Amino acid sequence: MKKSIVNKLKSLKKRYIQLEKLLSNNYSKFDKREFSKLSKEKANLYDLYKEFMSWLSIKSEIKDIQLLLNDLDLSTLAQEELLIALKRKKEIEKKIKMLLIPIDPYDKNSCFIEIRAATGGHEAAIFSGDLCKMYMKYADFKSWKVDIINMHEGEKGGYKEIILKVIGIGACGRLKFESGGHRVQRVPQTESQGRVHTSACTVAIMPEVPKSKRIILNTSDLKIDTFRSSGAGGQHVNTTDSAVRITHLPTGCVVECQDERSQHKNKEKALSVLSAKIYSKMNAEKKLKNSLMRKSLLGTGERSDRNRTYNFSQNRVTDHRINLTIYRLNEVLLGKLDLLIEPLLQEHQADLLSIID
């Protein structure tokens, strides 16, 4: 391992031992909150500490075995043991590097999916409906709950825009690579000549930010409009101003919600989505400014950002970020998204590991 990694591990080892002494000898000195904080820090360091101690042990063992290589009687056995020990050392180093990969604090969270029809008119809206169904089926496979926050239906079907909330542990971590441009190549339902058209949609994945960690939104920065709902809602539709549109003036982020009959509930939902949008915008700007990865797997959600192409006539899906092509489009649309998500996650991990190396 690189000297810089070993030095970091030595520092983490020192901190772990320090925490162990603090928590065992000074239990009564800490209040409940401080004790919980230190215990959590110790628990987070445990796996790295354990693997580093194993690495130090195997390193010492290798030195002892190497001394036996010059012994004529034991050299053959020593060579065999050395190969086993070196293999074990390599395995431990791989585990350590995996543990050193920074964890996105929002990977375990629920998330919002915003799907917008881009180029292609009615066909783009229809395709956004197909993507919506795909994500809903994938969520069903994962036993996640899906709520529709807001939607604007297309004239010929599908959606001009739809926002879903996917509720479940790990939803954001698995879906975050869906952000970006999604292009479809097929013969539209409205095409009489049988010609293949190319249309596009954009997808943005935004983590649900817990209330305790949400960005404080100043009332003076918000423009709140109310209007009559045009969606589901029974007798309340078009009779009360229950729908809410909130604009965050400093960033230009706009969110609408008309899913609930109550204006208060719509406002609460809209603020939740707005907080996620602002966080995602700030996070994207931060990543762009301080990019640690040589190759970005996360799309910007803009029209020019073509992450994936869905070709219906060939039953083909191509993810352009990792040059992956599979001829199982029918399965992907039925919710088997892990066929694409798993390779993306593996590539993401490999990219982060290369930085550590």
Curated annotation (Swiss-Prot):
Gene3D superfamilies: 3.30.160.20, 3.30.70.1660, 6.10.140.1950
Pfam families membership: PCRF (PF03462), RF-1 (PF00472)
GO molecular function: translation release factor activity, codon specific
PTM field: Methylated by PrmC. Methylation increases the termination efficiency of RF1.
UniProt keyword terms in alphabetical order: Cytoplasm, Methylation, Protein biosynthesis
Superkingdom as given in the UniProt entry: Bacteria
Residues bearing the modification N5-methylglutamine: Q235
Compartments it resides in: Cytoplasm
Gene Ontology cellular-component annotations: cytoplasm
InterPro entries: PCRF, Pep_chain_release_fac_I, Pep_chain_release_fac_I_sf, Prokaryotic/Mito_RF, RF-1
SUPFAM superfamilies, per database record: Release factor
Its job: Peptide chain release factor 1 directs the termination of translation in response to the peptide chain termination codons UAG and UAA.
Record family assignment: Belongs to the prokaryotic/mitochondrial release factor family.
PANTHER family for the chain: LD18447P (PTHR43804:SF7)
Entry-linked NCBIfam families: prfA, PRK00591.1
Protein name: Peptide chain release factor 1
Native species: Buchnera aphidicola subsp. Cinara cedri (strain Cc)
Organismal lineage: Bacteria, Pseudomonadati, Pseudomonadota, Gammaproteobacteria, Enterobacterales
